[in-house]
């Protein structure tokens, strides 16, 4: 019996060793792939394309107990989604960057759908940094959001940083049914510490009950229309952001327009919504202004 036990133990040890070797080989392969991708020689580029294409998808639905489930949570390449502990009956998803980027020529997209009565919070684990790549093509980052009647979405990612030499176009389209609730924060930082910004174009389009609620576009950096850094636009500031809050109760009482800080203001929109626009010298000061505005609206 002792001999059989020893043989089985040796076989198990060999099996564990084989599994460890397989895991090490897989990890090495994944690491090599990521390093090649960062050098501009990844699998997608090797097939003759100019960048990496990836689409992440989230769908939230209310369950029988009144909580929120996620029947769709699809990561793709550099866009990794992770469910984390949420607030109350809301689900919470974090977007984790599994690779650097977007780089030149990349095509990233995030699609989010919130069903009737569902509540979803979406954030990110770190800032997104647009970087130059070997490909000189423009990179794109598209966000598509759909919130049904009675659904609620809090979209609160970290900042987007436009690094020197990068070229990125961001397009966000939000479609809200009547009775939907939304908190949407967008923050952009022009250049890392001590460097000039890259080229950044960003458009935000929001429809409420199929009618335009907000449609605005900003362009900054090399190649942007003249005056983007002048006193009528950024005035030398390097962090810009906005907070859009849509709530059905605003139909009865819409917050009054007011100045929140020297370079920040709250503006009621033609619908049950308010827009907070802010400029700041850095990302930390910008976040403080937007957080304070949201706290006042939540209070």
Show where each model-derived region lies.
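A structural signal for small-residue-enriched, beta-sheet-centric alpha/beta enzyme cores
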Residues: 186-299
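N-terminal, charged/glycine-rich beta-strand/loop interface patches
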Residues: 2-18, 42-159, 164
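N-terminal intrinsically disordered, cationic/polar leader segments
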Residues: 2-10, 51-76, 148-151, 155, ...
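Transmembrane beta-barrel architecture of outer membranes
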Residues: 105-109, 140-142, 167-171, 199-201, ...
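Short, structured patches in soluble enzyme cores that scaffold and shape functional sites
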Residues: 114-116, 124-126, 147-149, 157-159, ...
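Long, intrinsically disordered low-complexity tandem-repeat segments
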Residues: 15-43
């Amino acid at each position: 019996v002792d001999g059989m036990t020893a043989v089985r133990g040796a076989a198990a040890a060999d099996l564990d060793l084989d599994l460890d070797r397989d895991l090490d080989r897989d990890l090495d392969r994944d690491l090599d792939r990521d390093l090649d991708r960062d050098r501009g020689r990844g699998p997608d580029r090797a097939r003759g394309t100019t960048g990496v294409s990836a689409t992440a998808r989230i769908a939230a639905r209310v369950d029988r107990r009144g909580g929120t489930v996620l029947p769709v949570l699809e990561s793709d390449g550099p866009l990794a989604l992770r469910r984390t502990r949420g607030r109350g009956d809301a689900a919470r998803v974090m977007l984790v960057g599994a690779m650097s980027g977007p780089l030149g020529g990349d095509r990233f997209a995030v699609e989010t759908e919130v069903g009737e009565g569902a509540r979803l919070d979406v954030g990110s684990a770190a800032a997104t940094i647009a970087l130059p790549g070997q490909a000189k093509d423009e990179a794109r980052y598209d966000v598509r959001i759909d919130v049904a009647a009675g659904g609620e979405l809090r979209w609160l990612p970290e900042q987007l940083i436009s690094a020197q030499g990068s070229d990125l176009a961001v397009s966000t389209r939000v479609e809200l049914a009547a009775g939907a609730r939304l908190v949407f924060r967008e923050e952009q930082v022009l250049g890392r510490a001590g460097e000039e910004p890259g080229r950044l174009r960003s458009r935000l389009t929001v429809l409420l009950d199929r009618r335009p609620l907000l449609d605005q576009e900003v362009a900054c950096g090399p190649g942007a229309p003249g005056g983007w850094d002048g006193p009528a636009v950024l005035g030398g500031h390097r962090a810009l952001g906005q907070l859009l809050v849509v709530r059905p109760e605003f139909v009865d009482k819409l917050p009054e327009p007011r100045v929140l800080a020297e370079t920040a203001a709250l503006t009621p929109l033609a619908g049950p919504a308010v827009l907070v626009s802010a400029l700041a010298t850095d990302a930390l000061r910008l976040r403080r202004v937007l957080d304070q505005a949201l706290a006042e609206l939540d209070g």
